[in-house]
A protein has these predicted regions:
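Interhelical loop/hinge segments that connect adjacent transmembrane helices in multipass membrane
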Residues: 1-4, 116-117, 177-183, 195-240, ...
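Signature of the first transmembrane helix
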Residues: 2-65, 93-101, 128, 224-254
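Membrane-interface junctions at transmembrane-helix termini in multi-pass inner-membrane proteins
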Residues: 5, 67, 131-154, 344-376, ...
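Transmembrane helical elements of multi-pass membrane transporters/channels
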Residues: 7-23, 183-199, 215-286, 306, ...
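Helix-loop junctions and terminal segments of transmembrane helices
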Residues: 57-73, 144, 262-304, 308-311, ...
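Interfacial segments at transmembrane-helix termini and the short loops linking adjacent helices
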Residues: 104-125, 309, 318-348, 354
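Hydrophobic alpha-helical transmembrane segments
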Residues: 153-169, 173-203, 374-379, 393-414, ...
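Membrane-proximal transmembrane or re-entrant/amphipathic helices at the cytosolic face
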Residues: 444-487
Length: 487
């Protein structure tokens, strides 16, 4: 089993643990302990900070993935590459402080909300942005050192444990909501601090003047890559977080809270994608440099098949149990039912692409991926403006699904006609049809009235059996087994 598979499995293990913890926090504890407005506030802080942190990074993560192998030399302190990261992010964060200082009132405005929560806690956007920026930059730097799992472990597992402890402290009146927000912000510092410590322990945390010869040779292209990754990263953050911001603008914090809780359930479909890309990026860049196209095609096929297989399984598993989901989440949040469906569908569309997006990003056509992503961000904003006033929070989710479908189609077209990668496979048709057929078979089996927990377990067992049998019947499973053996 290769490095991608090992790191992906380790990362996925912590991701799944994080999903369990996140599900307990978001679906069970948050709705029962916090008000909808308070949940909305937390998610607005996260959304704004993620967007600002991505902008403040000034594209350095793209530069790290694309160029670090030219600097890699531990005996020479990686030719001062960490100093480049520090300088670039320092300039970016200073720019954020200036923009937020001048326009914070306009940024936090809402047409529908008279709540004072945002104005009371707007100062927290600054430290949350700083800790988020530190994490996303150090996480990528650690990944190119072969330490991709530590970030996943800290962010998806340790931070969520800390979050659970804090929300329980709030429940038992050991702290107030103001204390919760303060300690929540401090907890966000844990992942970057631990990554820093691990990098220091391994000798990767050293500062020196960047190597002038390497910069002279690659500096111009590094600036170009960084510039395009600013647009790409900003587009990605718009796609991921702008819906919460726009729901707050049109509908208020309460609607943002409901959307955020149900959105989390829909994002479970993307779990198979999360850990794979981080460790694969530097490897794909190397394969392009060596022009190993056959190996790149094989990586695309295995990543796409495995992600789609697991993504479809999670999607149909959620939707067959949707009534049980709203036994876990309070019924007050049932207006977000179709948010779960459309967000799940949006993430399922991206599973079709596998590592195809990263194949474009790490190729000489990286600029096109940037324009595709920026186009996606623009399309998400436009469709949110159209759909939210008409359909409410379900409109925001529908906007994401529609936009990501267009995005995936454009990426597949480019993979085929520009990179010579065959994007559509037999499995891309069989796996979704197998999932739909499995769902239909379970749906039309008459079941007697029973407790919702028993029904959830029974539905899950049935969907697993039918899905597994049909996958084996259509000979999809052997391909996935090969993926885990050889990737």
């Amino acid at each position: 089993m290769g490095i991608i598979a090992r790191q992906t499995i380790k990362g996925s293990f912590y991701s799944y643990l994080g999903v369990v913890l996140g599900g307990i926090n978001v679906a069970i504890l948050y709705p029962r302990i916090l008000t909808e407005d308070q949940i909305g506030l937390i998610n607005i802080l996260i959304a704004l900070s993620a967007i600002f942190a991505q902008f403040s990074s000034l594209g350095i993560n793209g530069v790290t993935n694309y160029f670090f192998h030219y600097f890699r030399d531990l005996t020479r302190r990686h030719h001062g590459y960490l100093s480049i990261i520090a300088i670039v992010t320092g300039i970016g964060f200073a720019g954020f402080l200036l923009i937020y200082g001048l326009f914070s009132e306009q940024i936090l405005s809402s047409r529908a909300d008279n709540s004072t929560l945002l104005s009371d806690y707007n100062i927290y956007v600054i430290p949350v942005t700083f800790f988020t920026l530190a994490f996303i930059v150090l996480d990528v730097y650690a990944a190119v050192q072969g330490k991709s799992v530590i970030g996943t472990f800290m962010k998806d597992f340790v931070f969520r444990i800390a979050n659970m402890v804090l929300i329980l402290c709030l429940y038992f009146d050991l702290i107030g909501f103001a204390d919760f927000i303060f300690l929540y912000t401090l907890a966000l510092a844990l992942p970057p601090v631990v990554i820093l410590a691990e990098l220091g322990r391994k000798g990767h945390l050293t500062l020196k003047a960047p190597d002038a010869d390497i910069l002279k040779k690659h500096g111009k292209k590094m600036k170009s890559v960084g510039g395009y990754h600013i647009l790409a990263g900003f587009g990605n953050m718009l796609v991921t977080y702008i819906d919460r911001y726009m729901i707050n603008f049109f509908l208020g914090l309460g609607a943002t809270g409901i959307y955020s809780v149900t959105n989390y359930v829909g994002t479970l479909v993307q779990i198979p994608r999360r850990s794979m890309g981080k460790i694969a990026t530097p490897m794909l860049a190397r394969l392009w440099a060596e022009n190993k196209r056959e190996e790149l095609q094989n990586i695309y096929e295995r990543s796409s098949i495995s992600q789609l297989l697991l993504g479809v399984y999670i999607f149909i598993g959620i939707w067959i149990n949707i009534d049980a989901v709203f036994k876990i989440i309070p019924r007050d949040y049932e207006s977000g039912k179709w948010v779960i469906f459309y967000i799940g569908l949006a993430n399922l569309f991206q599973c079709f692409l596998g590592l195809g997006g990263l194949l474009i990003t790490t190729s000489r056509y990286y600029k096109m991926r940037t324009w595709f992503t920026f186009m996606l961000g623009f399309l998400v904003v436009l469709t949110n403006i159209i759909f939210i006033p008409i359909l409410g929070i379900a409109g925001a989710a529908m906007a994401s699904a529609f936009s990501k479908l267009i995005f995936v189609v454009f990426n597949m077209w480019f993979l085929h006609f520009k990179l010579g990668i065959v994007p559509l496979l037999r499995e891309h048709v069989i796996i979704p049809l197998t999932g739909a057929l499995s769902y239909g078979l379970v749906l039309f089996i008459p079941l007697p009235a029973m407790h919702w927990v028993i029904e959830l377990v029974l539905n899950s067992i049935l969907i697993t059996i039918f899905y597994g049998i049909l996958l084996r019947t259509f000979r999809v499973v052997p391909n996935v087994k090969q993926f885990f053996r050889s990737f």
